[in-house]
Amino acid sequence: MAIIPTTQNKVALYAAGLYGMKLGSATNSAVLFDVQNNPSGVNGVLNGYYAPFASMTSAQVAAIVVANVGIKAGQYGLTAQNVADAVATVTAELNANAPFGKQGETIANVMTDFTNTYESNAVYGAAAKAWNVKIAQAVSYTGNSQFDAAFGEIVTEFRLTGAENENRTGTAGDIVAPMVTDAL
């Protein structure tokens, strides 16, 4: 499932890949405001948001990104060597773009590439598919919640709109909710 590289999707990929966060609507709106007001657009903003990681080596940042996308030994049939190879690939991309100050843009490009081309990859395909589901959920979360949350966090509150406008919370399997039966 390829994800269209809209600004919002690119921001979601970046936030999840580098920061391990899914953005609430307030933070997403602030980021989109920054994008609108930066002459370099979304890439300029993402390069600026890379600043907290500037004191780290490219390999350290790559290890964070690789872990955040779910490439971990023992998951999805991945080995420690698969993880090391992924870290080396991301490290090489960061090193190639570091002299130009484009590490933020590079992270976004790596995330987009992983999202759109790795689902059929024999080694990383299962991780890419799981990542894409999480990104779709993160984009949906952004539109429905004002608060930021750790990427992969399960939302346990859902707003049900009906005659009573009820809010119910709980965990999987313990919620019984009225169904909407109105015809469309």
List PLM regions with ranges.
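Substrate/cofactor-recognition hotspot
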Residues: M1-L184
